[in-house]
Amino acid sequence: EIETDHRKYALRCFHKRLDALHERYDAITKHLAGVKGPYLVACQFQPQGITTESGTYPVVRMDWVDGQSLAAFVAEHLQDSGALQQMRFSLRRLARHLRENGIAHGDIQPSNIVVQRGANLRLIDYDGMFVPALEPFCSTELGQRNFQHPSRRRRHFNASLGAFSFSVIDLALDALSRQPGLWPRTASGEDA
């Protein structure tokens, strides 16, 4: 988190080379600029973002998103089945929005979904994101394994990437809304 001119940003510094990083983030930022809706955060790729004694490294700057992770929200509302069921519907709207805009986040998991006031959802961490212009590429990451299909490979890189992840979260929220006692037996931290 950094603050400049009374605005907060999240800053991600890349300390190792990733395939076509500039081209990927260029495609992502261009696509997101044309997408309306409350779920995505403005981001900017800066190829010469930070200079240290060992070299110059690219950064991605995103608007800061206040709120709590989906995991924290679930833990806080574990005894409120209505809130968990409402979150299921909110996540379904988010999934539909991404699908309708040809986007896959690439790493849907509780720590990449921020719940803001009023249960508004925002996605963060776009490193594995798919947009149509990236169709010729492979994925740079496979996402948090607890939320990815076991057969997922780098070549599986298209707009349907998030379907399995959203289904897992939907099923988990439904189960927890009916049996909150499952949470302490199955949760393993922020990415559970």
Regions found by a protein language model. Name each.
Residues 151-160:
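Conserved end of the kinase activation segment
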Residues 125-130:
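Activation of the activation-loop gatekeeper triad in protein kinase-fold domains
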Residues 137-151:
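Conserved activation segment of eukaryotic-like protein kinases, specifically the C-terminal portion
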Residues 1-42:
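ATP-binding glycine-rich loop module of kinase domains
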Residues 95, 99-111, 115:
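Catalytic-loop of the protein kinase fold
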Residues 112-124:
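Conserved protein kinase catalytic/activation segment
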Residues 39-86, 136:
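Conserved structural core of kinase catalytic domains
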Residues 175-192:
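Helical subdomain adjoining the active site within ATP-dependent kinase catalytic cores
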